[in-house]
Amino acid sequence: MKDFLEDYKKSVLERKSEGIPPLPLNAKQVEAVVEILMKDPTNAAFAKELLIHRVSPGVDEGAKVKAEFLAQLSQKKLECPHISALEATTLLGTMLGGYNVEPLIVGLESQDKNIAKESAKALKTTLLVYGSFDKIAAMSKTNALAKEVLESWANAEWFLNKEPLNECIEACVFKIDGETNTDDLSPASDAFTRSDIPLHAKAMLKNRIENYEQRIEAIKTKGVPVAYVGDVVGTGSSRKSATNSIMWHFGKDIPFVPNKRSGGIVIGGVIAPIFFATCEDSGALPIVADVKDLKEGDIIKIYPYKGEITLNDKVVSTFKLEPETLLDEVRASGRIPLIIGRGLTNKARKFLGLGESEAFKKPSAPKSDAKGYTLAQKIVGHACGVKGILPGAYCEPKVTTVGSQDTTGAMTRDEVKELASLKFDAPFVLQSFCHTAAYPKPSDVSLHATLPGFITQRGGVALHPGDGVIHTWLNRMGLPDTLGTGGDSHTRFPLGISFPAGSGLVAFAAVTGTMPLNMPESVLVRFKGEMNPGITLRDLVNAIPYYAIKKGLLTVEKKGKINVFNGRILEIEGLPDIKMEQAFELSDASAERSAAACVVRLNKEPMIEYLKSNIKLIDEMIASGYEDKETLKKRRDAMQAWVDKPVLLEPDSNAQYAAVIEIDVAEITEPILACPNDPDDVATLSEVLADTTGKRPHAIDEVFIGSCMTNIGHFRAFGEIVKNAPPSQARLWVVPPSKMDEQELINEGYYAIFGAAGARTEVPGCSLCMGNQARVRDNAVVFSTSTRNFDNRMGRGAKVYLGSAELGAACALLGRIPTKEEYMNLVSEKLESQKDKIYRYMNFNLMENFRL
């Protein structure tokens, strides 16, 4: 006891010096707290406060110890002089769900009427009851208090007893001009602290503005709630930590939940879709409105029901809250609590023979004269058990495949615990360790040791550090025409559809097997024509924003930003026979368009080829000891069933799109690349070289070949171009996306070529692409095959171009961006005659002696 108190008080002081609260108690610490309460009256008051306020809820390990102790007190099996049986029952009711539910159900039958009533009162506000609902329903036939609990749920008292949003909200503006991406709000270099919300929040905006801590603290002294305001807010990664940081600074404490806050206000001219959804999930109020007349320090009034923002009693901006259920979401403390609670209310009403509840806002049916459905609308419809879902409709589709990666995995674990779940209902949940494998910190090593078991115990599948990028694996676990999600903005399946999400929604999807969705509109990109020699899939990726800019559907300028793709589904057709790895290049880059999702219309043949390969991969995973075996077997069997009877959904010819962009690939005669530092700022090779302003530098310091945007063909092509050439003129990084690619490249002799070229080869994974571990040199000019090139992402002050591996090889040889002629000559000389050999893909079922 003494050691615990000394150690704990020391840690409190250490964190207080940083301006943050102590960490929540772990299981051993809770055991020590219980011992103090039972044996040490001198420190009992302090220990009681810790037990009440410093233990995470749900199925956290500490919550188990807390619930078991309180249950013994509530049931009078144990006496504590500092917590009565009645108070113990009350405290059980603060734990949200999980380990506290069974003791409260037992309490309904207590001989002590006060404890029985208190148990009922606690259960009325407990939403995370899952299978225990049936137990309470059965009890209600003979137990009046159990029936009272059901009636309370049926009447949505848990919701109606919460205060609705005020008619007028006074707030102080904290404004970041231009674009704020999620790396600004949650820097990759601090990814290892993400699950420690208060500590991670200290890094918010440190790379974006000067004196960031003083500026944030100064705005909090205004005495009114703070609204985070920006022209464009939340682009980039799906990291919920970005939202957590805003809420930590500007939100409200959650009673009995340590180190977490909810609420807060975000106002943006454009709010990226994943970030918007994460705000919804967390109980924040996201508002899309013109912000040009809002300045930092302004005291504004927000009228959420009227849709007006006033400054000095003058209307300076108007808005319409969307989705229609947003006010309910805020009232319920978030979209996820609303969905769970609404489901509980409906279940109780059905059991009691009551009609539909009138307590909640019902989404209106979408107003549309559409007669047909797009491919995306049909896939989502299929996941909902209907023919299609039109834009504007609210739905909760079944989720077939869920992905979680390591820099968000610890947060997802915390969210799963908070959801009080011990089993995943989603058929396939995959956890990777791709972002922290290369240069793990002690916290990463701990995560590598503890997270796999947490996932596999719940029926998920855990990869190993060094296996490679999550998307390379998760794509191979997908099924045609099904829906998925993942805690990474590049969760963009090349088959079916996936809606990336923050860690909270990923946990919800894994736990429940469903996810909420307000169906977005679709933008159709239709390719036609034949590709010219030297033109790559990556050039087609960059052609999408290039042609959108031409049509006035996309602007690079952030103020008054136009982006036809933002929040919509990108649907791509016209390339029906490309391989799945190539299709992923297209779907993956929809993240940089800020699209909600992407579908690529393909023929059956590439899908059959891909699934046959993936069946072999799963067989080898099982043979190599990957867990959970049953989950892997079920997914393999589902793949085989589709291969045996392959049927694909098709879009209707009369489907409607928000916009149609047609791209004749024959018009593309030279590479297209994204320029520093914006994935929307695309230009042809000639246009880049013609730019003498200095914004598009021509000398290249470093070249990176890697990320989820690459496949084995890119590395062979790169190798062939640099083969037998003098060592690279630029610092060179080579990082295959998976250990399977790495081994095959070694077997084929390409690693020897990379070494001779002076390349630094890394563990398969995401390190340099994300910039959370390896970094390019400060102020370097970089050519990269990676996903995005936001300021400071790959290195402080770095200027980063994005393009193909083939163009990267030319940059490496020359130390500069080549001319069109130089590039075409290299490709023609080195690649053209052996294209079939170079651009072969990883068909494991056809590879001799393939083993993991």
From Swiss-Prot:
Record note on cofactor: Binds 1 [4Fe-4S] cluster per subunit.
Coiled coil: none
MF terms (GO), sorted A to Z: 2-methylisocitrate dehydratase activity; 4 iron, 4 sulfur cluster binding; aconitate hydratase activity; metal ion binding; mRNA 3'-UTR binding; mRNA binding
Domain of life of the source: Bacteria
Biological processes annotated in GO: propionate catabolic process, 2-methylcitrate cycle; tricarboxylic acid cycle
Gene Ontology annotations for the cellular component aspect, listed alphabetically: cytosol
Cofactor(s) the protein requires to work: [4Fe-4S] cluster
Residues noted as binding [4Fe-4S] cluster in the record, renumbered to the chain: 708, 766, 769
Disulfide bonds: none
Catalytic function, reaction form: citrate = D-threo-isocitrate; (2S,3R)-3-hydroxybutane-1,2,3-tricarboxylate = 2-methyl-cis-aconitate + H2O
Pathways involved: Carbohydrate metabolism; tricarboxylic acid cycle; isocitrate from oxaloacetate: step 2/2; Organic acid metabolism; propanoate degradation
Keywords (A to Z) from UniProt: 4Fe-4S, Iron, Iron-sulfur, Lyase, Metal-binding, RNA-binding, Tricarboxylic acid cycle
One family name in Pfam for this protein: Aconitase_B_N
E.C. code: 4.2.1.3, 4.2.1.99
Positions of substrate binding: 194, 237-239, 405-407, 489, 788, 793
Function: Involved in the catabolism of short chain fatty acids (SCFA) via the tricarboxylic acid (TCA)(acetyl degradation route) and probably via the 2-methylcitrate cycle I (propionate degradation route). Catalyzes the reversible isomerization of citrate to isocitrate via cis-aconitate. Catalyzes the hydration of 2-methyl-cis-aconitate to yield (2R,3S)-2-methylisocitrate. The apo form of AcnB functions as a RNA-binding regulatory protein.
Subunit structure: Monomer.
UniProt record similarity statement: Belongs to the aconitase/IPM isomerase family.
Protein name: Aconitate hydratase B
Organism, scientific name: Helicobacter pylori (strain J99 / ATCC 700824) (Campylobacter pylori J99)
